[in-house]
């Protein structure tokens, strides 16, 4: 499996000049190739453009695989544009934009362009770039050297390095590491997760009546606060006729990303901890692929859905689960919130038995047929579990008429703290 290790780089003067040159060349190559695509009468594949531009000045300033990566990313962006146009997913899809004149873009280095030597990254500089750096900056170097962060543990083979320029002149260095995970847990126990906004994750188990709710209030609070502060400063910016973000706005964006990342990592850590505690070998997650495109929940809720990065959270769960020998599956959430998980079988979860009226208000599900009263997200989580077990030819080992009340795990400023310890059935 592939893991991404990240560390922050505050460059030396020479590193700043070399990286500034390379990341600028990435933007220029993107624009040249994008212009060609926009003005071409026929379709151009990534391979076509790589052949066409291999002698281009900006292409030759980059290592060949880095230049190819720029063209491949542009091809993916155009493919997404054509797909959105064809499927009608977006109201008015636009082709990939040009990078601003002085923009610096992320540069990708593949395996042939770098080596890890004595806890340092050695990146090969192209012949064209060596000439430019020598003429303009009197830098005579075949390689760019970057010290690895001392706290970084590279327990695998580094396949790709991406260097991301930040607004303050520093960089984030991403190392994609391939690690072998041979261990696979096989217990037959399944955890199901219903993802949401107010309740970040509601968790149920096939081998227990226990359930847990990871509270999403802090994530909402963080987004609400930064929305407000950034909006204020952007209004001032607009009144003053500034096009670029101020230093303060960029700082707020950085703080927001950091806080959201911390919360999502902590929540995913808690999920894996529970999976280990309940001896789970499979985590099944409600698939939210089309929730943002297909649903209209009102302006405020739609804003929350767009801010909340479901994909990132799921990716954190997936890679951490694999490291523990746990597989992750996705299953449609259709009708799971409207059907009763107490008396309906897995085959009955569908439009025929779905009743919106059973969901009385946020947080409460009351079944008019069997009289069951339970947490609404807990009900959804149990139905996700039932649907998955049906798919793999299994069923719940026990009835669910005596479900335990969900244990709420709340953010305490550092992590999600457990309020009680539930009994785990055998």
Feature-to-residue mapping (PLM):
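Gly/serine-rich nucleotide phosphate-binding loop at the start of the catalytic core
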Residues: 1-69
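Hydrophobic alpha-helical scaffolding
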Residues: 9, 60, 64, 254-261, ...
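Stable alpha-helical structural segments in soluble proteins, enriched in small hydrophobic residues
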Residues: 33, 70-81, 378-388
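Substrate-contacting helices/loops that form the catalytic groove of nucleic-acid
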Residues: 39-55, 156-158, 165-314, 395-426
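Acidic carboxylate diad motif detector
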Residues: 47-166, 303, 307
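Hydrophobic residues embedded in beta-strands of well-ordered beta-sheets
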Residues: 114, 119-123, 170-173, 200-201, ...
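Positively charged, low-complexity nucleic-acid-binding target-recognition regions
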Residues: 304, 308-426
